């Protein structure tokens, strides 16, 4: 089994926490906060961190899949958004996440793009784990906005 992924949160003040990523010396300490009125919004909140983790994992997985087929240096921009709603008890929950990955090149320039697109989501540990509880919709577009997946 692989090593566990560990982070440590240290309370600073109000609703702010410093997040230490441990054995990664290049990783800066991240300051989190919650949105007003409880916090000041001085850092990303938990929902933003969840969405960032899903988006980062998907983008990295797509890059990995593209590189498997000898596509190097494929620029991309990933945007993700969480939909929030209240459950039966009135508690706010993440109801869904939408992710759009826009490649910075034309689809026609990429080797075996169909194969890369067919498999990249399966490599994404975070997205597949989150999907057990939250729907995640993923779209990939090329540089002119042509939808490659739906």
Feature map (PLM): residue ranges:
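Extended beta-strand/beta-hairpin segments
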Residues: 1-52, 60-150
């Amino acid at each position: 089994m692989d090593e566990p992924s560990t982070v440590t949160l240290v309370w600073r003040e109000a609703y702010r926490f410093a997040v230490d990523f441990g054995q990664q010396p290049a990783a800066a300490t991240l300051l989190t906060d919650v949105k007003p009125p409880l916090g000041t919004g001085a850092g990303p909140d938990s929902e933003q961190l969840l969405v960032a983790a899903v988006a980062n994992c998907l983008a990295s997985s797509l890059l990995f899949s593209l590189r498997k087929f000898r596509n190097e240096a494929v620029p991309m921009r990933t945007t993700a958004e969480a939909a929030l709603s209240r459950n039966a008890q009135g508690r706010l929950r993440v109801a869904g996440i939408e992710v759009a990955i826009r490649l910075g090149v034309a689809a026609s320039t990429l080797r075996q793009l169909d194969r890369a697109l067919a498999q990249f989501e399966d490599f994404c540990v975070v997205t597949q784990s989150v999907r057990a509880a939250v729907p995640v919709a993923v779209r990939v577009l090329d540089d002119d906005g042509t939808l490659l997946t739906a």
